[in-house]
From Swiss-Prot:
CDD domains noted in UniProt: proteasome_beta_type_2
Keywords carried by this UniProt record: Cytoplasm, Nucleus, Proteasome
Name recorded for this polypeptide: Probable proteasome subunit beta type-4
Lineage: Eukaryota, Fungi, Dikarya, Ascomycota, Saccharomycotina
Gene Ontology terms: biological process: proteasomal ubiquitin-independent protein catabolic process; proteasome-mediated ubiquitin-dependent protein catabolic process
Gene3D superfamilies linked to this entry: Glutamine Phosphoribosylpyrophosphate, subunit 1, domain 1 (3.60.20.10)
Gene (UniProt): PRO2
Free-text function comment from the UniProt entry: Non-catalytic component of the proteasome, a multicatalytic proteinase complex which is characterized by its ability to cleave peptides with Arg, Phe, Tyr, Leu, and Glu adjacent to the leaving group at neutral or slightly basic pH. The proteasome has an ATP-dependent proteolytic activity.
Species in which this protein is naturally found: Meyerozyma guilliermondii (strain ATCC 6260 / CBS 566 / DSM 6381 / JCM 1539 / NBRC 10279 / NRRL Y-324)
TM ranges: none
């Protein structure tokens, strides 16, 4: 029942994730953050099997931080981070116990000054998109994003569109997902909006 949404706009990337951690029909926690800060300009939002998501997220977070330490505080770019995550999932799918994790990777490339949003699924498929979703958000919000997304949108426009998507999910989903955390990745780093 995870909800993961992302929108890339002109100056940043916005990500929304549901707060509810569920098991079957039970809500176990209503403050679950389904994102991990990989470095100062890369944020990973994830959905999937409960144990797999946390273990995979911690593994990716630790390895990107290890890279930064080894390379004299040089951080991986969003493109390099997406390639690393994709490779780990593609390698995992060929093992006896693959990770059942889907990822949205939001980033801001400080060298080019451009935001990015990468959609990566548990099979290791990766594509850079202007907007993306995993979980039930994909079923309910893709048409809304298709209709209202415009090239050249700014932060406020993107936030309004994300709120429209969340309102649509609240209206149409039969389960209460306890609201969403909204985070933004821009030239200044990663911030919690709501």
């Amino acid at each position: 029942m995870d909800i993961v949404l992302g929108i890339r706009v002109e100056d940043c990337t916005l990500v929304a994730t549901s707060k509810a951690a569920t098991r079957g029909i039970s809500v176990l926690k209503d403050t679950d953050d389904k994102t991990r800060q990989l470095n100062s300009h890369n944020l990973m939002a994830y959905s999937g099997e409960a144990g797999d998501t946390v273990q995979f997220a911690e593994y990716i977070q630790a390895n990107t931080q290890l890279y930064t330490m080894r390379e004299n505080d040089t951080e991986l770019s969003p493109k390099a981070t997406a390639s690393f995550v994709r490779n780990q999932l593609a390698t995992s799918i060929r093992s006896r116990k693959p990770y059942q994790v889907n990822v949205l990777l939001a980033g801001y490339d400080t060298n080019t000054g451009k935001p990015s949003l990468n959609w990566i699924d548990y099979l290791g498929t990766q594509v850079e998109l202007p907007y993306a979703a995993h979980g039930y958000a994909g079923f309910y919000c893709t048409s809304l994003l298709d209709k209202h997304y415009k090239k050249g949108m700014n932060f406020e426009d993107g936030l309004d569109l994300l709120k429209k998507c969340i309102k649509e999910l609240e209206t149409r989903m039969p389960i209460d997902f306890k609201g969403c955390y909204i985070k933004v990745v821009d030239k200044e780093g990663i911030k919690l909006v709501e």
